[in-house]
């Protein structure tokens, strides 16, 4: 079963919580920060990120950066003493900041 949520930034905490519980979610993004990859209100299928999930540059992920939830791209990955750190940003060159893997809750597997 795929849960369905509307992504609206800070309020998208519920989607992150469901992903942390292992649920695959259909999330509808609002805004133009990811155009032309994603259009506003275009749904995606987001799977939970687990220890086995491979994260790469250009993956679209649901994550939390500085208290806000984003459906944005991984722009860069750097090794750290405890794993890796991921630079999150939109599709227009704005960088939100670096996060640890524990702040990445889901990965987009399909754009609908």
Predicted regions and their residues:
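Extended hydrophobic leader/signal-anchor segments used for secretion and membrane insertion
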Residues: 1-112
């Amino acid at each position: 079963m795929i849960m369905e949520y509307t992504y609206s930034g800070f309020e998208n905490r519920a989607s992150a919580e469901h992903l942390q519980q292992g649920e695959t979610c259909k999330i509808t993004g609002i805004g133009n920060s990811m155009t032309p990859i994603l259009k506003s209100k275009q749904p995606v299928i987001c799977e939970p990120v687990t220890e086995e999930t491979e994260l790469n540059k250009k993956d679209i992920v649901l994550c939390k950066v500085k208290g806000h939830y984003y459906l944005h791209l991984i722009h860069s990955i750097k090794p750290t003493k405890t794993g890796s750190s991921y630079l999150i940003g939109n599709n227009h060159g704005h960088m939100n900041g670096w996060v640890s893997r524990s702040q990445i809750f889901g990965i987009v597997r399909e754009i609908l």
